[in-house]
């Protein structure tokens, strides 16, 4: 492990986030600013993403901005029919080093690593606005409901 990892781990500012359906490593999160931020409106973390998302759209509990530092990923976002507001496909855009991405808490996406190569990002999250979930058949499904069903299938 790196010196940075060891220091952050000793300070209690590191968290390994497992894939919520398989339990395998998904992301290494380092709390650069605050670990517990109930009283503060934003936070800054360093993410090392080591696994692609499952290929299903999800949103986040907060708006965010991320800057790709190393590596990159394909970001899949919904392609929406402007007349019916229904999702009719996906946009797939490469996000490489230097890319800056901003999203509200209600915007959907999923991330696909390129050849399973890790990606490092600086991640700025705003205040929590809502619970997060997944988009199934053009309907929002709470993350706990989706993940419970995903584990049993």
What is each residue range found by the language model?
Residues 1-43:
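A short, N-terminal "cap"/entry segment at the start of jelly-roll beta-barrel domains
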Residues 23, 38-42, 64, 76, ...:
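Beta-sandwich/jelly-roll carbohydrate-recognition scaffolds of carbohydrate-active enzymes
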Residues 44-60, 105:
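Conserved short histidine dyad/triad with adjacent acidic residue
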Residues 51-52, 73, 107-109, 126-130:
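Short, solvent-exposed loop/turn segments at secondary-structure junctions
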Residues 60-75:
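Short, conserved beta-strand element in jelly-roll/cupin
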Residues 77-111:
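Short acidic-glycine-tyrosine-enriched beta hairpin
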Residues 102, 116-133:
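A short hydrophobic beta-strand segment most commonly corresponding to one strand
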Residues 131-153:
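Active-site or metal-binding loop neighborhoods of secreted/extracellular toxin and effector enzymes
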């Amino acid at each position: 492990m790196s010196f940075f990892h060891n220091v952050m781990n000793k300070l209690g500012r590191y968290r390994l986030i497992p894939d919520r359906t398989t339990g395998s490593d998904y992301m290494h999160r380092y709390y650069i600013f605050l670990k517990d931020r109930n009283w503060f409106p934003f936070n800054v973390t360093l993410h090392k993403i080591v696994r692609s998302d499952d290929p299903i759209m999800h949103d986040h509990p907060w708006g965010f901005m991320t800057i790709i530092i190393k590596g990159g990923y394909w970001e899949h976002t919904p392609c929406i029919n402007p007349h019916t507001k229904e999702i009719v496909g996906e946009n797939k855009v490469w996000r490489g080093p230097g890319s800056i991405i901003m999203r509200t808490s209600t915007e959907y996406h999923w991330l696909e690593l390129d050849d399973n190569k890790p990606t490092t990002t600086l991640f700025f999250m705003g205040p929590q606005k809502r619970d997060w979930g997944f988009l199934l058949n053009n309907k929002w499904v709470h993350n706990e409901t989706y993940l419970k069903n995903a584990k049993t299938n």
